[in-house]
Amino acid sequence: MAGKVFFSVSMSLDGFIAPESLGDLMGQQWMELQQWIFPQRFIRENLKLGEGGEEGRDNEIARETFERTGASVMGKRMFDLGEQAWPEEAPFHTPVFVVTHEKRDPWERPGGTTFHFVNDGIETALDQARAARRSWST
């Protein structure tokens, strides 16, 4: 059975998705787009930001989204920003496929996250994610 692919992204009304770096103005504005998620209890625990946090519907949506995800696909810019910001135990706990031109060996993190670097396009990354999801979740 083929798994479902769903698209999850934060985007401003003018189509802005990811900054060049977190240090520039666009990076700061991008972080403002994300501010709703960081107070959520599930995210605080998953990113090792401390105890407590909000437990409303936003928290449940974040938790449900992470729990139903068997593998993730992301671009190199998202990976680069996350590599600097994520704790040692990256928050995914699943295989992650990074679409990039950079050749790099898989990077395994504590807690079940392994980053795989895919050099031949999004279609290949999606195929690999589907295959990994099936083997990971069985």
Give the ranges of each region predicted by the language model.
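Portal/gating segments that form or line small-molecule/metal binding sites
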Residues: 1-138
